[in-house]
């Protein structure tokens, strides 16, 4: 049986925590930042936790992570 390919786009965007959940960085923090409030930019620095509904999809995309 052949190995399952890892989705490289997902592998670059998501990390798995010790408890088996996934986390990723927020969008909207790369450019055009002057119009965004300091509080909003500060909150975008935090990691975003993936919902349980989407975790199953990530498990299939990232079999060896």
Curated annotation (Swiss-Prot):
Q: Which GO biological process categories is it annotated with?
A: translation
User: Would you tell me the Gene Ontology cellular component terms?
Assistant: cytosolic large ribosomal subunit
Keywords per UniProt: Ribonucleoprotein, Ribosomal protein
- Per the record, the domain of life is Bacteria
Record keyword Magnesium present:
no
**InterPro entries per the record?**
Ribosomal_bL35, Ribosomal_bL35-like, Ribosomal_bL35_CS, Ribosomal_bL35_sf
What GO terms are given for molecular function? structural constituent of ribosome
Cite the residue spans of the region called Disordered.
1-65
Start-end of Basic and acidic residues biased regions: 50-65
Nuclease: is it a keyword of this entry?
no
SUPFAM superfamilies the UniProt entry points to: L35p-like (SSF143034)
- Ranges of Basic residues composition bias in the record: 10-44
For this protein, the record's PANTHER family field holds: 54S RIBOSOMAL PROTEIN BL35M, LARGE RIBOSOMAL SUBUNIT PROTEIN BL35M
Similarity annotation: Belongs to the bacterial ribosomal protein bL35 family.
Name under which the protein is recorded: Large ribosomal subunit protein bL35
Q: Which gene produces this protein?
A: rpmI
């Amino acid at each position: 049986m052949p190995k399952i390919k890892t989705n490289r786009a997902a592998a670059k965007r998501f990390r798995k925590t010790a408890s088996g959940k996934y986390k990723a960085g927020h969008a909207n923090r790369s450019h055009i930042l002057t119009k965004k409030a300091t509080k909003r930019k500060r909150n975008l620095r935090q990691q975003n936790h993936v919902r349980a509904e989407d975790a199953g999809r990530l498990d299939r995309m990232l079999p060896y992570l």
